[in-house]
């Protein structure tokens, strides 16, 4: 099975890495700041509309192209500034797991990730079961 779509949106620049920690009764408590919760909810709302009827099974190849509003950059120019691709992917895979694209993001055995400046911002996603 192959799932392929484009989500027109301003991609979140806050990432999974930005979780916060506080200490309560001598124990660390991790929490998501409001900005991260908002980004996660926005992504969840977009992805829930596109989830498959049945979760992908077995090994999955995930391709994601992140298109950020170009500003003064050229359309299609690679984005070489933060956020890092691995942090973007962690949030994306967590949300894709939560809405039911697969059972566990450990199933993602192959990843292709790119980030660009673009005239039309959004996220291109292609997920496919590998034989």
Feature-to-residue mapping (PLM):
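Acidic, proline/glycine-enriched N-terminal capping motif
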Residues: 1-131
């Amino acid at each position: 099975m192959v799932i392929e779509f484009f989500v027109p949106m301003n991609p979140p620049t806050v990432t999974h890495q930005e979780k916060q920690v506080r200490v309560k009764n001598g124990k660390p408590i991790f929490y998501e700041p409001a900005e991260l919760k908002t980004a996660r909810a926005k992504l969840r709302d977009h992805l829930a509309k596109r989830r498959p009827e049945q979760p992908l099974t077995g090994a999955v190849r995930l391709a994601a192209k992140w298109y950020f509003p170009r500003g003064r950059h050229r359309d299609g120019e690679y984005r070489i500034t933060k956020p890092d691709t691995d942090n973007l992917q962690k949030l994306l895979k967590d949300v894709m797991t939560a809405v039911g694209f697969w059972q566990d993001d450990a199933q993602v055995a192959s990843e292709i990730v790119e980030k660009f400046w673009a005239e039309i911002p959004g996220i291109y996603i292609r997920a496919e079961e590998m034989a």
